[in-house]
Amino acid sequence: MVKQIRRYALFQATPDSEFVKEMYGGYFNVFVSAFGDEGEQWDLFRVIDGEFPRDEDLEKYEGFVISGSLHDAFTEEDWIIELCSVCKKLDVMKKKILGICFGHQIICRVRGGKVGRARKGPDIGLGNITIVQDVIKPGDYFDQIESLSIIQCHRDEVLEPPESARVIGFSDKCDVEIFSVEDHLLCFQGHPEYNKEILLEIIDRVHKIKFVEEEILEKAKDSIKKFEPDTQRLHMLCKNFLKGRRTH
């Protein structure tokens, strides 16, 4: 019997920066490097450009990842409305969806939560997330850990999580850093896929266009010098979720 190839898809909600294209060949390769395993097939849908899988093809995939974006998840842009529609279908199908930053907020919106501008302002740099211990089940895809260090880069946030959500992590900047719904939706406000080089380049870009106050960017650079993200643990956690693995 021929072993069936496990298929996953990235919904890319941001254009590739020149830096990422030059260094990695595009964000798609960054995500596959972080969350992919040998023998899998990963497909790219540039949802920001209106590229979506056909309804009849959704069943072919084991899981989906929604990337970050400079766009607001709470707007009525055509492609965002279409993305929400596709995610609703996947939710009904109980397909695994890993939402990251903008993707985290899209899943919140789809599930009836509230998204908007971050109450405490933009968060850029290395941040520490406190894990809510009593929602972690022993042997689940989520390790028994007290905290996670993650790269942050956002100005919006989940203001009210969906009623059905379990809030797994919070920080001093954001009340809903990580949430899950049942066993098929997992969302991070931060960026498990980013490394320091990608973040530093983003800081330079937003500084040039004055997208964020300079004081915030200086603090971000300082945090990058002082701390390290829990990259390996974050990648393994996301893989465990997408592939139905357990920690023990």
From Swiss-Prot:
The keyword Cytoplasm applies. GO terms for biological process: proteolysis. The lineage of its organism: Eukaryota, Viridiplantae, Streptophyta, Embryophyta, Tracheophyta. Pfam families: GATase. One of its GO terms (cellular component) is cytosol. It is found in: Cytoplasm, Cytosol. Its EC number is 3.4.19.16. Disulfide bonds: none annotated. GO terms for molecular function: peptidase activity. Residues 17-212 form the Glutamine amidotransferase type-1 domain. It is an enzyme of class 3 (hydrolase). Gene3D superfamilies: 3.40.50.880. Involved in glucosinolate biosynthesis. Hydrolyzes the gamma-glutamyl peptide bond of several glutathione (GSH) conjugates to produce Cys-Gly conjugates related to glucosinolates. The gamma-Glu-Cys-Gly-GSH conjugates are the sulfur-donating molecule in glucosinolate biosynthesis. The keyword Transmembrane helix does not apply. Belongs to the peptidase C26 family. Keywords: Cytoplasm, Hydrolase, Protease. InterPro entries: ChyE-like, Class_I_gatase-like, GATASE. This is Gamma-glutamyl peptidase 2.
